[in-house]
UniProtKB/Swiss-Prot annotation:
Residues 5-82 form the Core-binding (CB) domain. Belongs to the 'phage' integrase family. XerA subfamily. It comes from Pyrococcus furiosus (strain ATCC 43587 / DSM 3638 / JCM 8422 / Vc1). This is Tyrosine recombinase XerA. The active site is at R135, K160, H226, R229, H252, Y261. Residues 98-274 form the Tyr recombinase domain. Transmembrane segments: none annotated. One of its GO terms (cellular component) is cytoplasm. It is found in: Cytoplasm. Pfam families: Phage_int_SAM_1, Phage_integrase. GO terms for biological process: DNA transposition.
Length: 286
């Protein structure tokens, strides 16, 4: 019983430490979850024990990306305990850089078309994710006061890394938001709320996933919130938008994170060159 109480105290203090470090609520939730599992199994705050824990998770089928997240959580915990040398000994596993999967513009259109006209909230969720490149957590945390209707901007509060950013809203999307709000009858400060709950809590990421899964099935498309974000970036790049602007819109701290989309469009560029067929009359007969 005493051990359980001590663990709770450590987790609470660790969460406070992460908050002071500027970590987002989602990061704090994940880090404390993995630390609780680490402590529950009786591991000590050493790199050696951390490796044993990671090996156990890998054997359970955890992906390299998930393992990487656990490493980040444990490194933060070691630093919290003042064990900087142990933190340094932990190495992040190499994550293979895979091309993000994005929908085609035709698939996005098909997805929107299967949403019933009376499901105004659901339609707006899809339009916002695709039309602004928001992360699902950012969408759920969006408040009505974060939207500047006069100037046509929305402000993302405390995005990844705890940074705010401003995103322009296209006029058609702004009109959709106004139409949606005119039909709202609750007084929640959040732009999106749960429709099935009496107290109208803010929308959860789980609900967004469920909504997309439902309409994706109807459209015959596998779609996730992150895929819509990828699609936003890819389609912007394909239309000639500067990659640095896309970086700002996505809220990427590093340009290298955004540059993966230049690889996504390689196929698109190849097809364009082949369609142009500039050399047909020059070497076609050889």
């Amino acid at each position: 019983m005493r051990e359980k109480t001590l663990r709770s105290e450590v987790l609470e203090e660790f969460a406070t430490y992460l908050e002071l470090e500027g970590k987002s609520k989602n990061t704090i939730r994940m880090y404390t979850y993995f630390l609780s599992k680490f402590l529950e199994e009786g591991y000590s705050p050493t790199a050696r024990d951390a490796l044993r824990f990671l090996a156990k998770l890998r054997a359970k089928g955890y992906s390299i990306r998930s393992i990487n997240l656990v490493v980040q959580a444990l490194k933060a915990y070691f630093k919290f305990e003042g064990l900087n040398e142990e933190a340094e000994r932990l190495r992040n596993p190499k994550i293979p850089k895979t091309l993000p999967k994005s929908l085609t513009e035709e698939e996005v259109k098909k997805l929107i078309e299967v949403i019933p006209k009376d499901k105004i909230r659901d339609r707006l969720i899809v339009l916002l994710l695709y039309g602004t490149g928001l992360r699902v957590s950012e969408l759920c945390n969006l408040k009505i006061e974060d939207i500047n209707f006069e100037k046509g901007f929305l402000t993302v509060r405390g995005g990844k890394g705890g940074k705010d950013r401003t995103i322009p809203i296209p006029q058609p999307l702004l009109t959709e938001i106004k139409n949606y709000l005119r039909r709202r009858t609750d007084d929640s400060p959040y732009l999106f709320v749960e429709s099935r709950r009496k107290n109208k809590e803010k929308l959860s990421p789980k609900t967004v996933w469920r909504i997309l899964k439902e309409y994706g099935r109807k459209a015959g498309i596998k779609v996730t919130p992150h895929q819509l974000r990828h699609s936003f970036a890819t389609h912007m790049l394909e239309r000639g938008i500067d990659i640095r602007i896309i970086q700002e819109l996505l809220g990427h701290a590093s340009l290298s994170t955004t540059q993966i989309y230049t690889r996504v469009t390689a196929k698109h560029l190849k097809e364009a060159v082949e369609r142009a067929n500039l050399l047909e009359n020059l070497i076609g007969g050889e």
